[in-house]
């Protein structure tokens, strides 16, 4: 009898300690809301630059497979419109396909 009371009491204590309180759950939801944010990377703009011109966004570059890519000149980062991704013809064709998909989801005007 005493053993069963001890087991029941221990089970209740474990259940109370293990269950999260309402306050901690509310705080956790608040933290989740703070972490959720929408980041818009591209703004709707018409293209105005050709391959080789300096750019800041994909929307500035004209062409279905042209994206604003990063190259390094003299150790400095330069962004320019480009469509070539590799010297290998097969990899370059795959890269152009990826550029096309990236431009599709950029929502440029």
Swiss-Prot record:
Keyword Secreted: yes
Tissue: Expressed by the venom gland.
GO cellular component annotations of the record: extracellular region
Disulfide bonds: 47-62, 55-68, 59-108, 61-81
Leader sequence segment: 1-18
Listed GO MF terms: ion channel regulator activity; toxin activity
Key words of the record: Disulfide bond, Ion channel impairing toxin, Knottin, Secreted, Signal, Toxin
Organism superkingdom: Eukaryota
Localisation: Secreted
Residues cleaved off as propeptide: 19-46
Predominant localisation class: secreted
UniProt similarity note: Belongs to the neurotoxin 25 family. F7 subfamily.
Biological function: Putative ion channel inhibitor.
Domain notes: The presence of a 'disulfide through disulfide knot' structurally defines this protein as a knottin.
Protein name: Hainantoxin-XVIII-6
Organism: Cyriopagopus hainanus
């Amino acid at each position: 009898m005493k053993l069963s009371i001890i087991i029941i009491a221990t089970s209740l204590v474990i259940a109370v300690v293990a269950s999260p309180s309402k306050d901690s759950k509310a705080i956790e939801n608040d933290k989740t809301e703070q972490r959720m944010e929408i980041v818009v990377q591209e703004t709707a703009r018409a293209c105005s630059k050709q391959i080789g011109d300096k750019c800041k966004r994909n929307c500035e570059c004209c062409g279905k497979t042209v994206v604003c890519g990063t190259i390094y000149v003299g150790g400095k980062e330069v962004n320019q419109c480009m469509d070539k991704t590799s010297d290998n013809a097969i990899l370059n064709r795959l890269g152009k396909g990826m550029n096309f998909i990236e431009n599709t989801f950029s929502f440029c005007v």
